[in-house]
């Protein structure tokens, strides 16, 4: 249905309509059954929302929709004026996420993940104190609990959890073009 609505927004020149963008995003979040919602609104040249004002408006609209649905919801703005992390492409971005869970990720991506997960713990009511929540996240990375939870999540979804230990199990590109 979302694809059809996006096509309709395209032909009616309402692709940039913040209320329609917000309702599209939040309808999926609410339909998933989440108890609380933490949103990462990207802003800048590498994002759909090109300026801070429109990103802030989108964030506020989505938070209000969450409030109306009686779901604790917060939104953060992330600067996308430059790439985040070092990887570009589905498989290698997942590998970068796994490396981050193992404590070996790029500094900028690791910091964003820690900040974001700290917010999740607080919004979900797991921990009220930000310093304690952050410490819990850092401990999950350093102890290996985070990557083990990801391994469980892969299994729950019918995936092969061995990809965490053997990156060659990821699908490889059908064609590689040398640009030299």
Give names to the regions the model predicted.
Residues 1-8:
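Self-splicing inteins and homing endonuclease
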Residues 12-24, 28-31, 35-180:
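Well-ordered secondary-structure scaffolds
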